[in-house]
């Protein structure tokens, strides 16, 4: 059920086609009072009356008019009220600062070929890197989210390498942190006016996943150890890993990158509201 008195938070929104050829919106809302989720449907006529900015992840909304369908366990929404607009992500100044901090780690890399490749690649795609989200839903799903996530990974890596008795190849760890999600600059699209995120279907047809892309560019450049870390960073095959960490005799570095990535995805600035204050 739903209530017109509850202020809901937008979790995710997407638009698809019905069998009749019309548009249908799918909106998932969270009740901040108990954390429960409400799945909503909006027909094309309702979508045409609403501003896309309404559906930005993190927005606080009130359902003005709707009906609950018990059979499908969803709410057919015909009118919404924006209560509070969420921050879309990093502003331009913040993006520049994060980009500068991220790329400063490249100067800590001793391997000239690897350092040169990273600097050249990031310079070539800097505009995409500065705005790309790190996900559509799971974590850092906002403008500049990939920048924040990648910078967090580099920070966590440095702290952990300084504290560990085991001494990994720092060059490769920094590079794997910088590149493990780099394919996301092509995998996702983000509307800078509304903050809405979607998949780029052309990328998914060509590359399947961002992990495959990152693995491939590193292998092409001869950075096999970095490629292997990227292949394993999701941890399990069912989570999208090319190399499953359940396999035997894997290098410790593979586990390190996975754990660092997971730390940022769980404990970093995972949503735009955390950027405020």
Kindly label every feature range from the protein language model.
Residues 2-21:
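Structural detector for short beta-strands of small beta-barrel domains
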Residues 83-201:
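Acidic/His-rich, divalent-metal-binding segments that scaffold phosphate/diphosphate chemistry
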Residues 18-44:
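OB-fold (S1/OB) nucleic-acid-binding surfaces
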Residues 45-63:
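Short nucleic-acid-contacting surface segments enriched for D/E, G, S/T with interspersed K/R
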Residues 64-66, 143:
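Metal-centered catalytic cores of metalloenzymes
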Residues 67-93:
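OB-fold/S1-family single-stranded nucleic acid-binding modules
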Residues 174-177, 187, 201-205, 212-276:
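Histidine/acidic-rich helix-loop-helix segments that form or flank divalent-metal centers
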